[in-house]
Amino acid sequence: MTVRNIASICNMGTNASALEKDIGPEQFPINEHYFGLVNFGNTCYCNSVLQALYFCRPFRENVLAYKVQQKKKENLLTCLADLFHSIATQKKKVGVIPPKKFISRLRKENDLFDNYMQQDAHEFLNYLLNTVADILQEERKQEKQNGRLKNNGTAIATDTEPEQNKIDPTWVHEIFQGTLTNETRCLNCETVSSKDEDFLDLSVDVEQNTSITHCLRDFSNTETLCSEYKYYCEMCCSKQEAQKRMRVKKLPMILALHLKRFKYMEQLHRYTKLSYRVVFPLELRLFNTSGDAVNLDRMYDLVAVVVHCGSGPNRGHYITIVKSHGFWLLFDDDIVEKIDAQAIEEFYGLTSDISKNSESGYILFYQSRE
């Protein structure tokens, strides 16, 4: 255990008692726990995402429900379930937990994370959600195959076998998956073709002094395909000028928005951070939806923000702010603090292009209202 980890545990009592005092005994939510996570050497990218996901209630509830199922072989999901269960069943309301088992499993499963370097929180989120979904789908596939076997081990032939081989969406998809529709209109024959594409999170470009609504509008701006970028129209049987646009067709239960704050600079031969000020509201409604979108009036509430602190992707630090039972908390590895809602503005970014460290919202989690 490192000196930093020992110090984390030594400071646990001080931080915990201060947090309980800030929240107040009468206001402290029943059956809720606020636990920091020990940093095992530049694992703040992991800690910040885990805290955000823990406070996405539908995700937490499904992970905890997975924990109570029959004993399974260790994988990333079982380790995640053990960690969430450990937090949720603590006798104390606040404190610090070392996610050692989860980090060890993560490093075993993916070489990208098997080091002590700073990693990208968005890459980790993407990897985690896809891995959990893959594990669930593989388990369901095995269950279906086992269900088609007779007691003597021979397969039962059924007319519905192709249907049984079809992979159903998992609870990861039910929570985070939305659908984009890519519409292309030929400017010669006016034929519109569309192609759907599923997503677990949306990555949007950022500009200086804008808002999330502006970023999403830009994401869905109409683009003209001309010159060498002409579109091959099936109806015209030739390349034609066309207009292309992206719309949201299916709105997810939880919308994860990734702000593309790291840009490769050719002259520097490296990625640099765009610390632009991008306002993210506490409430969000999407306006870049397709005409046939389901629940197009869905209102979202901000529940968590992964914040990048520093000047570049491979240096700096990640923290998380979450909303829990009407108030806001800041998780900085082992430290947990209650913050005012007004303090969220500090994480919008910088109003000027001055090259200095900034604390900027990087991944936003919006949960839809019932």
From Swiss-Prot:
This protein's record includes keyword Hydrolase: yes
One GO term describing the cellular component: nucleus
InterPro entries: Papain-like_cys_pep_sf, Peptidase_C19, Peptidase_C19_UCH, USP_CS, USP_dom
Record-listed E.C. numbers: 3.4.19.12
Catalytic residues, chain numbering: C44, H317
One biological process term in Gene Ontology: regulation of protein stability
Record-annotated USP domain positions: 35-369
Disulfide bonds: none
Binding-site residues for Zn(2+), renumbered to this chain: C186, C189, C233, C236
Record's keyword annotation contains Metal-binding: yes
Catalytic activity: Thiol-dependent hydrolysis of ester, thioester, amide, peptide and isopeptide bonds formed by the C-terminal Gly of ubiquitin (a 76-residue protein attached to proteins as an intracellular targeting signal)
PROSITE patterns, A to Z: USP_1 (PS00972), USP_2 (PS00973), USP_3 (PS50235)
Entry keyword set: Behavior, Hydrolase, Metal-binding, Protease, Thiol protease, Ubl conjugation pathway, Zinc
Signal peptide: none
EC top class named in words: hydrolase
Pfam families: UCH (PF00443)
Family of this protein: Belongs to the peptidase C19 family. USP12/USP46 subfamily.
Known partners and oligomeric status: Interacts with WDR48.
Protein role: Deubiquitinating enzyme that plays a role in behavior, possibly by regulating GABA action. Has almost no deubiquitinating activity by itself and requires the interaction with wdr48 to have a high activity.
This protein's name: Ubiquitin carboxyl-terminal hydrolase 46
Gene name for this UniProt entry: usp46
